[in-house]
Amino acid sequence: MYPPKEFFGAARNIEEGGSLTIIATVLVDTNSRMDEVIFEEFKGTGNMELHLSRRMAERRVFPAIDIDRSSTRREDLLLGDKTAQRTFLMRRMFGQLIAPQPQGAGYELTQAMEAFLNRFNRTKSNDEFLQSLVS
């Protein structure tokens, strides 16, 4: 595991600053214990995780992103305070949609994404979408 982990860690170790973006993919939920071990080992080396939903893709709901499981490390440093707070609110709202009843709405992941996309498509920008969540 050491050589691949060292390679992925290279994105943080560029001489004289700068940055290197490395995109890696891993297939999980394969029922293979080895795949899970490899995923968990490399999980800590990345700055961002994007989880795709097979169920959404099969139902032709795009982007098939599992918002609840996807995240960026230190997202608060990338966004301004107001945008970060609204993004955290969006994530909490999405979590409430997919939480089982009576605590949440009990939506399937696909239904929750469709609800978000319907609302998103009625706005002209990401900022307007996030603002619509607080009004």
State each model region's role:
Residues 1-135:
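P-loop NTPase catalytic core
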